Design a protein with these regions (language model features):
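Short linear interaction motifs
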Residues: 96-116, 121
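Structured, hydrophobic secondary-structure cores that serve as assembly/anchoring elements
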Residues: 1-91, 112-384
Length: 384
């Protein structure tokens, strides 16, 4: 504070009140990978509406699934999508086709397929519409797991094997993806009514649900806009078989339209059974990582631990008040631990700071715990 003022007048002095509150990161930016006859290849293009997509890649006649998926995304509430055209050249076999989607890492700016999305930080949802090959779906799941804050929306095959819905198998176990069935009938201005994979619709519904209700709410019981029908009609008995397997159904109800009727991940871990729980933790973990990067320039001592605990607690308190966490009190909804126990001498000597966070996303006082560490390089590391 100034010790003296040399003349009469109004003086303004800015006072540092400490670090800024943690900001909630976005959750609804999607990335689409598909084959298209026109447009840039392996160069992610940001589209914020259908017109921007057609300007870069043309309309429905230029791709089998990609255009319809992006259109369904915007029609169902999506607002931002990065589109990666992996090229329309025919592959010799399934392995060759999968390789196009998996991509190659030739360095920044020259990566292809899924690798090209590693250059973009803001992607939250990853879709490869119509790609039901296990190798491609495994690659999409691995990408989301490695990038940590992304979630895969996967399609079941268009046609099920003889024997009924109990023959449907889901992808490999992962808490970073969800699987949807059946395919959706839509209108194509060049072909009439056609069947399209559900992933593009679901990515848009995720975005709509995030904006209207919050990422902590399950993206279920939502109308599928643009759907004229379904490849298969699912009965309650059939859904009772599919739901425990992590296969989310889209169903048609009398007088209620076509709706999403499931919100499970493909994980066998009960803690990560639901799509909204996984995506809520993605948002929280990324928000905390981004909002605590300043700590790498501060002395790693009890004063710092107290500031970090205060900032993260304030952020989680806002989420609790919004209904994202369960509990009659903040103590039942979350806890933050950053002290000498999480930061012993060997951690401090390594230039790291570790915070333990527990949240109750389903039941009060039943915490799902993760630890986040800030490193000298400025990067964060999360373990669950």
């Amino acid at each position: 504070m100034a010790t003296s003022y040399l003349s009469p007048g109004v003086y303004v002095e800015e006072v540092d009140r400490g670090t800024k509150p943690l900001e909630m990161v976005g959750t609804s930016t999607a990335a689409f990978l598909g084959e298209c006859k026109t447009g840039p290849v392996n160069d992610p293009v940001l589209c914020t509406n259908w017109s921007q997509y057609t300007k870069n890649f043309g309309d429905f006649k230029n791709s089998e699934y990609l255009a319809h998926a992006v259109y369904a995304f915007f029609n169902n509430g999506g607002a931002r999508a990065f589109v990666v055209n992996v090229g329309s050249e025919s592959a010799k076999d399934d392995a060759g086709k999968a390789a196009k989607y998996i991509g190659k890492d030739n360095g920044p700016g020259t990566r292809t397929g899924l690798k090209a999305l590693e250059d973009i930080d803001e992607v939250n949802i990853v879709v490869a519409p119509g790609q039901t090959d296990p190798a491609v779906q495994d690659a999409v799941l691995s990408h989301c797991e490695n990038m940590r804050y992304r979630f895969a929306v996967l399609d079941a095959p268009e046609v099920i094997e003889k024997g009924g819905v109990d023959k449907i198998t889901k992808p490999r176990d992962s808490k970073y993806g969800a699987y949807y069935f059946p395919w959706v009938e839509v209108y194509d201005p060049t072909k009439g009514n056609v069947l399209q994979p559900p992933s593009g619709f679901m990515a848009g519904i995720y975005a709509r649900n995030d904006g209207e209700r919050g990422v902590h709410k399950a993206p279920a019981n939502e109308i599928v806009r643009g759907a004229l029908g379904l490849k298969y009609g699912i009965t309650k008995g059939e859904q009772d078989l599919l739901n425990p397997k992590g296969i989310n159904c889209i169903r048609e109800f009398p007088n209620r339209g076509i709706r999403v009727w499931g919100a499970r991940t493909v994980s066998s871990d009960a803690s990560w059974r639901y799509v909204n729980v996984r995506r809520l933790f993605n948002m929280v973990e990324q928000s905390i990582e981004n909002g605590t990067q300043w700590v790498v320039f501060e002395p790693n001592d009890p004063r710092l631990w107290k500031r970090v605990t205060r900032d993260i607690s304030a952020f989680l308190l806002r989420l609790w008040r919004q209904g994202a966490l369960f509990g009659k009190s903040p103590e039942e909804a979350f806890y933050v631990k950053c002290d000498e126990e999480t930061n012993p001498p060997e951690v401090i000597d390594a230039g790291q700071m570790i915070v333990e966070v527990g949240m109750a996303p389903v039941k009060p006082a039943e915490f799902v715990i993760f630890r986040i560490g800030q490193m000298p390089s400025g990067g964060g590391e999360v373990s669950e």
